[in-house]
Design a protein with these regions (language model features):
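Hydrophobic transmembrane alpha-helical segments of multi-pass transport and channel proteins
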Residues: 196-200, 230-235
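Residue-level signature of catalytic and energy-coupling elements of molecular machines
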Residues: 44, 202, 229
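Short helical (or helix-break) motifs at transmembrane helix termini and adjacent helical loops
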Residues: 134-144, 198-210
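Interfacial loop-to-transmembrane junctions
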Residues: 211-234
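Juxtamembrane boundary at the C-terminal end of a transmembrane helix
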Residues: 243-249
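Membrane-embedded alpha-helical bundles of polytopic integral membrane proteins
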Residues: 1-159, 163-193
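Hydrophobic transmembrane alpha-helices of multi-pass small-molecule transporters
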Residues: 15, 170-171, 230, 237-238, ...
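Re-entrant/interfacial helical elements at transmembrane boundaries that shape
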Residues: 144-145, 209-212, 235, 240
């Protein structure tokens, strides 16, 4: 089976699963779906941070996600976890602050992702998916067609033309969809800034992979690499959208 065939089959399965979860639109199903993705992403992040021997962190990651199902503001839990970790470090004088990295990335972002659904509903999640997906797709095709100027050294294949084209397409389509949720000025601002955040979410994961000396964050998704390779844009875009919706509406 060719790499392209694997990529297409995996992509089709992922789209079908996401569509089913969106159609059912049940909080605990969505929480469980995000939870599975989160734990795989957490595992991959440990690899990128060179911490695969820290098995005890999985327990705390799972415990935090279980609490998030019942706590009214899931993103608050990141700050509570930070205080607990700081207290533990002070008490034990362990001084291994690296242990907190996977709770900063990707944990905090997944808590914001759950908060987006909890506070603003499935419509907002679909808005997020539209913006992030079109930012990525638009950047790819515009970069192929018009790309001449490299965006940055962290991701050599990205071009300014591709990034700008992707952000513009995501902003236009995202704003049109968002009219069912917010007024046009808010739709434009939120779509634009969320798209920009997605660009840097992708860039940050590329930076982590470059530092770790790996091409992909994992290999669980045939033809696509790891979970983080698929959700990197969402990990910056979700917090951005939550903050913007809370601040502007």
């Amino acid at each position: 089976m060719s790499e392209l065939t694997k990529r297409l089959i995996t992509g089709a399965v992922l789209i079908a699963v996401v569509a089913l979860v969106a159609w059912i639109d049940n909080f605990f199903l969505t929480w469980a779906f995000f939870g599975v993705i989160y734990l795989f992403a957490f595992y991959e992040a440990l690899g990128l941070f060179d911490m695969k021997d820290q098995n005890s962190l999985y327990f705390w990651a799972a415990a935090l996600w279980i609490v998030a199902a019942f706590y009214p503001n899931p993103d608050d839990l990141f700050f509570i976890a930070l205080m607990i970790f700081a207290g533990y470090e002070a008490y034990t004088q362990d001084r291994n602050f690296k242990k907190f990295l996977p709770f900063l990335y990707p944990t905090a972002s997944f808590l914001f992702l759950l908060s987006l659904y909890h506070d603003f509903g499935m419509e907002a999640l679909i808005w997020l998916v539209i913006v992030v997906a079109l930012t990525d797709i638009g950047a790819y095709f515009n970069g192929k067609a018009f790309g001449k100027h490299p965006f940055c050294k962290t991701s050599p294949k990205k071009t300014w033309e591709g990034v700008i084209g992707g952000v513009l397409i995501a902003t236009i389509v995202g704003s049109y969809y968002a009219l069912m949720l917010v007024d046009l000025p808010y739709a434009i601002v939120i779509s634009f800034l969320t798209s920009v955040a997605a660009v840097f979410g992708d860039l940050f994961e590329s930076y982590l992979k470059r530092r770790a000396g790996v091409k992909d964050s994992g290999n669980i998704l045939p033809g696509h690499g790891g979970v983080l390779d698929r959700v990197d844009g969402y990990l910056f875009a979700a917090p951005a959208m939550v903050v913007l919706l809370r601040g502007l509406l």
